[in-house]
Structure formats: structure tokens, C-alpha cells
A protein has these predicted regions:
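N-terminal catalytic cores of NTP/NDP-binding nucleotidyl/phosphoryl-transfer enzymes
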Residues: 7-72
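Residue-level signal for inorganic ion chemistry
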Residues: 27, 80, 119, 179, ...
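Glycine-rich, Lys/Arg-enriched anion-binding loops that position phosphate/diphosphate groups
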Residues: 142-241
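N-terminal Rossmann-like or analogous alpha/beta NTP/dinucleotide-binding catalytic cores
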Residues: 59-123, 127-145
Length: 311
């Protein structure tokens, strides 16, 4: 997969099949669009091209209300490569680019560089200044320029449209298993291990505190989760607490994970991936630390019983 991170060095292709979108989450709806692009391009022996934007446009256009995002760009590229896209263009999105009109974007980037025989987009995608580039706009433009436009219908499950907005809502409410189903991959994110207060070690459950690499990363609702971690290429299961540790009357939000089979306690500064498999319970204020320890032992047993399902 070829990846271009500037519009100044993207190639000129004789013909291609193109899709355009933000693709935050690369969820099952996005994947249907991408699979259609790949299969169509392969059927005519041309390259498949995906044009996307980084950072998320709403991070530039809505500075006072930054949208929590579902994935770091590295995760997006990992999924796109697994779907066999040939060319990915990551257009740097800034205020100047946000003022480019839809027609100018199509003329100067899409048509000029990729000469599309077909453009395939999702039903709700808009692009260009003031979101002028609607599916209807693109269809009419395609008729002018002599290429076809396919607008794919939404993917639904149990009468619910799979969308980034709905998936964000699920994660914010702690429904991580359902969110992963709609994403088509297990929700999680790359993080850096930071030094904590050592509270978990005192309780007999040493933990690694972590913060997401992506500063605008969406995190699940407070609570205890069964997780799978990846450290230096190794998969480890564990349990994770997101919250404020109310038993100790603390107020700062902390993310900490206890790995069941971690052989080294010295992972400070390491990058790890934490995948949220299932939510176990709410965060609870216990009357004393001993009550918390008793509950943590029950939580661990609960998580261990779930491991076989994910092996």
C-alpha cells in the first residue's frame, strides 16, 4: 500500500477507482465502501485509491468542541492495508484547505491526479467548503466529466444504522463489545505507560497507568473492563479500571491496567495497545480497601472465565 501525506507528491494515475471520506473508525459501513472500491478496481485492473484527511476536519472547524475520535491514524492505515487498498492519500486538513470548494477539490486533486473511472462513496459523505460536495453534487459532476458515481446505502443491524456517531455513543456508555461488533475490529488504542501512585501494588494488583497516544482519543465510560493488551508484540489479558478511584477519595481521572501474566514490572515509558473486550462492572466506592481487594479478586475470576472466548 502506497501512502502519501501531502498533496504535493501524490502520483498521476492513468485511471483508478476512488473513494473519499474521513473514515473515523473504519467501521463496517466504511469497510463495505472500501471493499467495493477494491473489488471494482481489481475487476478492471486499475488501482484503488482512498482519499482521507488528517486531522479530523472537525478538530479544525470546531476548536471549542473537539470531537473525540475512534482511532489514531496509524490504526486507520493498518486497517486500510488489511482491506487491500492500493493508494492512500492523507490530506493535511487545515483552515486553508477547509476553504477549498468542492469543484476545485475534484478538479485539482481527484481528477487531475487519479483520473477516476468511478468514484464510490457512502450515503452521508460531504466534502468541500461548507460541505457543498454532496452525493448528488458528485453524481452530477461525474456526468459532466464522464465517470460513474456509486453512492452506497448505509449498513444496518437490528434496524440501527452503523455510523461513527452511534459507535461513539456506545463507547461513551461502556458498551464496548457492541461497539467492536459495529466497528468490525476490537475497540482499543495505543497508549504510553506512565508512572502512577503505586496504589494497585499495595492492594496486591500491580497496575500500569496509561494515557492514549492520540490526544483526542475517545475512551470508554468509567468502570472495570476485561482487556487484551499488546506489549512488544506479545498479547496479554488483564483487567482495567477507568475512573477516579473513589474508595480513596481521589478525583483525578486515571486509566490503569493489571495484566495477569506480565513477567516484567518495568514497562514505564513503553507503548502498549489496550483493547476493551467487555465491561465487567461500574466503578464503585467501597467502605474500605479490604472490600475493594475482595471485589478485585472476583473481577479477576470473572475475567479469567472469559479468556477462553477470546483465545
Amino acid at each position: 500500500m502506497e501512502v502519501y501525506k501531502s498533496i504535493n507528491n501524490i502520483p498521476l494515475l492513468p485511471e483508478s477507482v476512488v473513494t473519499i471520506g474521513t473514515f473515523d473508525g473504519c467501521h463496517r459501513g466504511h469497510q463495505e465502501v472500501i471493499k467495493k472500491v477494491v473489488s471494482t478496481s481489481q475487476s478492471i485492473n486499475k488501482k484503488s485509491v482512498l482519499i482521507t484527511f488528517d486531522p479530523h476536519p472537525r478538530h479544525i472547524l470546531q476548536l471549542d468542541n473537539k470531537l473525540p475520535i475512534l482511532m489514531h491514524v496509524s490504526k486507520k492505515l493498518e486497517i486500510l492495508e488489511s482491506l487491500n487498498i492500493n493508494v492512500v492519500v492523507l490530506i493535511p486538513f487545515d483552515i486553508e484547505f477547509s476553504k477549498v470548494k468542492a469543484k476545485d477539490f475534484l478538479n485539482n486533486i481527484v481528477v487531475k491526479h487519479f483520473n477516476p473511472s468511478r468514484i464510490i462513496i457512502g450515503y452521508d459523505h460531504h466534502f468541500g467548503f461548507e460541505r457543498e460536495g454532496s452525493p448528488m453534487f458528485l453524481t452530477n459532476y461525474g456526468k459532466e466529466k464522464g465517470f460513474n458515481v456509486d453512492v452506497l446505502d448505509p449498513i444496518t443491524d437490528e434496524n440501527i444504522t452503523i455510523s461513527s456517531t452511534h459507535i461513539r455513543k456506545l463507547i461513551k456508555e461502556g458498551f464496548v463489545r457492541r461497539a467492536s461488533f459495529e466497528l468490525g475490529w476490537v475497540f482499543g488504542f495505543e497508549s504510553q505507560v506512565i508512572e502512577g501512585a503505586g496504589r494497585g501494588k499495595e492492594l496486591g494488583f500491580p497496575t500500569a497507568n496509561f494515557v492514549p497516544v492520540e490526544k483526542n482519543q475517545l475512551v470508554p465510560a468509567n468502570g472495570v473492563y476485561f482487556i487484551r493488551g499488546r506489549i512488544n508484540g506479545n498479547n496479554l489479558y488483564g483487567m482495567c479500571n477507568l475512573g477516579i478511584r473513589p474508595t480513596f477519595n481521589e478525583t483525578d481521572f486515571v486509566m490503569e491496567v493489571h495484566f495477569f501474566d506480565l513477567t516484567s514490572n518495568n514497562i514505564y515509558g513503553e507503548n502498549i495497545t489496550v483493547e476493551f473486550l467487555e465491561r465487567i462492572r461500574d466503578e464503585i466506592k467501597f467502605s474500605n480497601p479490604q472490600k475493594l481487594i475482595e471485589q478485585l479478586n472476583k473481577d479477576k475470576q470473572n475475567c479469567m472465565s472469559l479468556m477462553q472466548k477470546y483465545n
